[in-house]
Amino acid sequence: MNDLTTPEAINLERRIFLKASAVAGGGLLIGFHLPLTNRAGEAQAAAAEFVPNAWIRIDADDTVTLRVASSEMGQGVYTAIPMLLAEELECDWARIQVEMAPANKAYTNPLIGQQLTGGSTAVRAYWLPLRQAGATARDLLVRAAAQTWKVREDECRAEKGVVIHKKSRRRLRYGQLAARAATTTLA
């Protein structure tokens, strides 16, 4: 019977472990590097998207992507936070996709002072910043529609992912306004 606790067996196992770790680590490095090589595709995609702030991206297909700075650990963050945004942005909650926010000071939890999840603070901490982000995006979309139609902004309203001109009933989807809204600023 082979005893796996002898010094020779332990050294052999250590060598195998180190070799396997080096191969796996190299594979991870390659895996994370390859997506960065397609800059031309990213530039094309960016032309048709609207990124009004660090939290929100609206694509030409009407998809709203929300970056969430708190991990989902059963407390409902990936449900509650998108609902806050949907309400303020005036869009269908089902159209919001959630992605984890990257490490960045913009996503610091204001109650904790760091970008981390804890203390059941996600909704309390991000309630106001996300409502403000949604309102800003909505206002920029309304302004972009008003500029497109050459009408006053107060003649337009956002509702269920579209901007509607009240008098003429013309409608533009958020995705249709994304490129123009990306070049629009608030007064």
Protein language model annotation of sequence segments:
Residues 38-80, 84:
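Conserved beta-alpha junction segments in alpha/beta enzyme cores
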Residues 64-99, 124-148:
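Alpha-helical support elements that line or immediately flank enzyme active sites
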Residues 10, 16-37:
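N-terminal export signals
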Residues 1-12:
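N-terminal secretory signal peptides
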Residues 110-149, 163, 167-186:
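Glycine-rich and small/hydrophobic secondary-structure elements
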